[in-house]
Amino acid sequence: RVFHLGCLLSDDFSPEVVEYLSTKGRISIDAQGYLREVRGEKVFAIDWADKRKILANTDIIKVNEHEMEVITGLTDPRQAALQLAEWGVKEVCVTLGSEGSIILAEGKFYDIPAYKPKEIVDATGCGDTYSAGYLWCRAQGMGYDESGRFAAAMCTLKLEHTGPFDRTIDDVKRVMK
């Protein structure tokens, strides 16, 4: 069982909730919402006050380049991934846009390529799409590299149209060839 926590704001899931859920299954986090705070009618980027408590109970995290820098203070993706792992995260996925992504798991880095889209229509939801693909593959028992490649291929298909991801597994496999 995997609990994927994709919060909208930094206080959606307390450290206590995450700790409790971690006793019931694996915890996956998309860091984006933890780095936002609403003041009045405006949304502000913030550091994540409870990050160390929550990451200690996190199995998988997905961050992009900006998020990893806010959380760790580091600009190098590999160094940031190592820092997140040091804080307790078992699988660190860092998405790097058109440069692909890296995954750090069990002390090893996996370099995941980005697949070139036919055209870029809309990038909205690509992070969520990556998380969904990666988590689905891992739940099927696939390895880190294959899961990352599948997730990257899903993102390529997502870039090519607006709206939620609505392609098939066969569509994704065609991109991966």
Walk through the language-model features, giving the residues of each.
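Conserved phosphate-binding/catalytic region of the ribokinase-like
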Residues: 20, 44-53, 77-177
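Conserved beta-alpha-beta core of the PfkB/ribokinase-like small-molecule kinase fold
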Residues: 6-82, 100
